[in-house]
Amino acid sequence: MSGFCVLAKYGEIAVKGRNQGWFENCLVRNLRHAVGGPVLIRRRGGFLVASAHHRDPAELTRRLQEVMGLNVVQPALSVPPTVEDATAAAVDLLRRRHAERPGAPVPTFAVRARRRWKDFPMSSDAFAAHIGARVCAELGWRVDLAAPEVPVLVEVDRREIFVSVERLPGQGGLPVGCSGRALVLLSGGYDSPVAAYRAMRRGLHCDFVHFTGAPYTDPSSMYKAYALARELGRYQTPARLYVVPVGNAQKTLATAGAEELQIVARRRLYLRIAEELARRRQRDALVTGDSLGQVASQTLSNLVSADQACTLPVLRPLIGWDKQEIITEARRIGTAEISVLRDEDCCSLLAPSEVATRTNPADLRVIEQRADIDTLVEQALEHVTVLTPGRVRGAEPPRAKVARPTVVAG
């Protein structure tokens, strides 16, 4: 008796040695969360097998494609470990695949067989040839071993055989959560959501902090940050978004004589607030969307000056990316349609006419002393709003719509 399943194949986890089991456990937890209901997960050498009878096969496959740590996601039929069952399954899969494309020319195919169970009665080549001959006889398809349009993938295990005609890319990287927890400084632009995604891909679970210009700006940037965090929730387990109003603090910095140092002084303020939030929430690092030299505030001198305002590590996954690379990645992961929406953000509030490209931390400390920076940080933290964005569900979420957030305690 055959049944639909998905082969979830990982890459980097396979070289983790004695720690591989721990990484696998983390991956299994994330797979269960991604499916969002009862799912049977079986472990095989080098991959996992996921089955969920209550799920549409295409939906199950799509959800597993969003799980970090998987290199390949392969929908398949699981059949008893006999030559006849596997051959019949291959013919059936190809027949159904062609029926879904009425009017299309008959494609070429090739069978790739692999035996993990070496006591199987046929060699891999002989098994592939046997299945191929049956396909040619029953369906009339042509064989192309060099560049087949449809590869038939057959994997022989001791207890079952997996037959597949599709091999889809996964997200790669490491399972979210296996590298620790971080707090992402999330703006409404292209850069920081992509930085969050890249951090997740290296195993970091990410919460988010967003700074608004309230009470001098409208809540549009908060709604936008909420939508971005919700979209990014497709790739990890539940996270929180902390919204911090810094309009009054920015006004204080502007009147403390910051002038062309104002933007870097703000960045130091944001890092101080984010660091204190991270410490209170037991997060291990901060993540920003900085790209070296992209704008005046992101010169090496200014990044060094900003980092000296905090002691937690500040991770910058996009430090060597150019803007077009970032936008291309944003489109791929689903955040670009939100980032392009207009909003009233804190960066546009009281913006100076010029921004220094080289700054001295000593000069910035003088400005912070005048503004009483510690008091500004405490006042901002007293007005934090905590949101739970959840995650997008469904095949094609309406990404260009910004939902109003849900506020929770804590």
Curated annotation (Swiss-Prot):
The keyword Electron transport does not apply. Coiled coil: none annotated. SUPFAM superfamilies: Adenine nucleotide alpha hydrolases-like, THUMP domain-like. GO terms for molecular function: ATP binding; CCA tRNA nucleotidyltransferase activity; tRNA binding; tRNA-uracil-4 sulfurtransferase activity. The keyword Nucleotide-binding applies. Residues 58-167 form the THUMP domain. Keywords: ATP-binding, Cytoplasm, Nucleotide-binding, RNA-binding, Thiamine biosynthesis, Transferase, tRNA-binding. GO terms for biological process: thiamine biosynthetic process; thiamine diphosphate biosynthetic process; thiazole biosynthetic process; tRNA 4-thiouridine biosynthesis. Pathway: Cofactor biosynthesis; thiamine diphosphate biosynthesis. It is found in: Cytoplasm. Its main location: cytoplasm. Its EC number is 2.8.1.4. GO terms for cellular component: cytosol. It catalyses: [ThiI sulfur-carrier protein]-S-sulfanyl-L-cysteine + a uridine in tRNA + 2 reduced [2Fe-2S]-[ferredoxin] + ATP + H(+) = [ThiI sulfur-carrier protein]-L-cysteine + a 4-thiouridine in tRNA + 2 oxidized [2Fe-2S]-[ferredoxin] + AMP + diphosphate; [ThiS sulfur-carrier protein]-C-terminal Gly-Gly-AMP + S-sulfanyl-L-cysteinyl-[cysteine desulfurase] + AH2 = [ThiS sulfur-carrier protein]-C-terminal-Gly-aminoethanethioate + L-cysteinyl-[cysteine desulfurase] + A + AMP + 2 H(+). ATP binds at L185, L186, H210, F211, R267, G289, Q298. Belongs to the ThiI family. Catalyzes the ATP-dependent transfer of a sulfur to tRNA to produce 4-thiouridine in position 8 of tRNAs, which functions as a near-UV photosensor. Also catalyzes the transfer of sulfur to the sulfur carrier protein ThiS, forming ThiS-thiocarboxylate. This is a step in the synthesis of thiazole, in the thiamine biosynthesis pathway. The sulfur is donated as persulfide by IscS. This is Probable tRNA sulfurtransferase. It comes from Nocardia farcinica (strain IFM 10152). The lineage of its organism: Bacteria, Bacillati, Actinomycetota, Actinomycetes, Mycobacteriales. The gene is thiI.
